[in-house]
Amino acid sequence: MAGRGFSWGPGHLNEDNARFLLLAALIVLYLLGGAAVFSALELAHERQAKQRWEERLANFSRGHNLSRDELRGFLRHYEEATRAGIRVDNVRPRWDFTGAFYFVGTVVSTIGFGMTTPATVGGKIFLIFYGLVGCSSTILFFNLFLERLITIIAYIMKSCHQRQLRRRGALPQESLKDAGQCEVDSLAGWKPSVYYVMLILCTASILISCCASAMYTPIEGWSYFDSLYFCFVAFSTIGFGDLVSSQNAHYESQGLYRFANFVFILMGVCCIYSLFNVISILIKQSLNWILRKMDSGCCPQCQRGLLRSRRNVVMPGSVRNRCNISIETDGVAESDTDGRRLSGEMISMKDLLAANKASLAILQKQLSEMANGCPHQTSTLARDNEFSGGVGAFAIMNNRLAETSGDR
């Protein structure tokens, strides 16, 4: 990547590094603010709970003529049993086949509720290697799901946009029949907005959470709010473990419930993962806007350099080049690959296998264009694409949304 820098700072800070440092600083501030809010909300409740527990412990010790040390020793034994999966109420076995299957599901999905953990040395060693392969495979699965989801959403929204143009008479019927005229078609540069995609994913996530909560509330005995809370914690793979579904020994229609629980968690994790990646585009736009505001006081030469074509960056719409050329991703220069390797994004298989010039995003875009009847066009402006065939989830959404396209 070109070493364009910002004038503030002694060494003309590289743009990618400036964005990385700005994001790191904002995350630290976000953590400090979150800690302050949670401390204000939860600290008093924690102190009250501790006071109630000390009173109950003293009353029980006096009522049964037990010393506090003896009672605490017994409670430590119970804590050890709890870590091994033993509960006061009757719960399902943790390490039969179905319990172990639930456990490996929480491992590879990175949810990690924590209600079941390996206790043997062999189990802990196996978990390290099992999780290394399993978590990597699941991340790949989520990325492939995101790729197909973005393609489907873009196809549906483009079809709706075409129908609207036809009804208004802005799009002749014949223009869509001739595949050779795709490059001059009125929709050649049209892409769905990331805001609409975010709204669709948010609606889908809420719908799945509400339906799952309606199932958990009567079966698990949770309140509806607690069920919604569990859905977010599980679907986002935070996985605190304070609430865990399908842990009782017996349920009505047990097989059906466990299957539905698996399906809801799988769908929820996929949707929330996709939503997080779409939101990250908006966060990156905001970072670029902040960087431009911070650099607005620079000399005119620096400002002209700031407005030049950017690589590997999502720019707000107010300063994007609004040409109508559809920019592809397969003409990216090798310098872009080097820049991405230095940026805050993950390195893709394209970077690891230099001989393979077609990345996941390029293949996906080519397939989409073939499905739409448009021949693949290689543009000389590809090296100026703002995502330049990026990597990871960014590569999947590259040039598929209006805000990730270099032609805006």
UniProtKB/Swiss-Prot annotation:
The UniProt record lists the keyword Translocase: no
Intramembrane segment spans (from-to):
95-115, 224-244
Residues in compartment: Cytoplasmic: 1-19, 146-193, 284-408
What name does this protein carry?
A: Potassium channel subfamily K member 13
Where is the protein situated, by its record's location annotation? Cell membrane
**Stated role:** K(+) channel that conducts outward rectifying tonic currents potentiated by purinergic signals. Homo- and heterodimerizes to form functional channels with distinct regulatory and gating properties. Contributes most of K(+) currents at the plasma membrane of resting microglia. Maintains a depolarized membrane potential required for proper ramified microglia morphology and phagocytosis, selectively mediating microglial pruning of presynaptic compartments at hippocampal excitatory synapses.
Q: Which InterPro entries match?
A: 2pore_dom_K_chnl (IPR003280), 2pore_dom_K_chnl_THIK (IPR005410), K_chnl_dom (IPR013099)
- Keywords of the record: Cell membrane, Glycoprotein, Ion channel, Ion transport, Membrane, Metal-binding, Potassium, Potassium channel, Potassium transport, Transmembrane, Transmembrane helix, Transport, Voltage-gated channel
Q: Residues that bind K(+) 1, according to the entry?
A: 110-111, 237-238
**According to the UniProt record, what happens if one changes residue 112 to E?**
Acts as a dominant negative when it assembles with wild-type KCNK13 or KCNK12 subunits, abolishing K(+) flux
Organism lineage = Eukaryota, Metazoa, Chordata, Craniata, Vertebrata
Subunit structure as annotated in this protein's UniProt entry = Homodimer. Heterodimer with KCNK12.
As one GO molecular function, the record gives: metal ion binding
Detail which positions bind K(+) 3.
112, 239-240
One Gene Ontology biological process: regulation of NLRP3 inflammasome complex assembly
Q: Recount the known activity regulation.
A: The channel conductance is activated by arachidonic acid and inhibited by Ba(2+) ions, volatile anesthetics such as halothane and antiarrhythmic drugs mexiletine and lidocaine. Insensitive to extracellular pH change.
Q: What is known of its domains?
A: Each subunit contributes two pore-forming domains 1 and 2 which assemble to form a single pore with M2 and M4 transmembrane helices lining the central cavity and M1 and M3 facing the lipid bilayer. The transmembrane helices are bridged by the selectivity filters 1 and 2 that coordinate the permeant ions. Up to four ions can simultaneously occupy the selectivity filter and at least two elementary charges must translocate across the filter to convert it into the open conformation.
Q: Which residues are glycosylated?
A: 59, 65
GO CC annotation terms, alphabetical: monoatomic ion channel complex; plasma membrane
| Listed Pfam families | Ion_trans_2
Q: Where is this region: Selectivity filter 2?
A: 237-242
The reported effect of residue 139 to D is:
Increases channel basal activity. Increases the current amplitude. Confers nonlinear I-V relationship, with currents that saturate upon strong membrane depolarization
Q: Where is this region: Selectivity filter 1?
A: 110-115
**Catalyzed reaction equations:** K(+)(in) = K(+)(out)
Q: In which tissues is it expressed?
A: Expressed in microglia (at protein level).
Positions of K(+) 4 binding:
110, 237
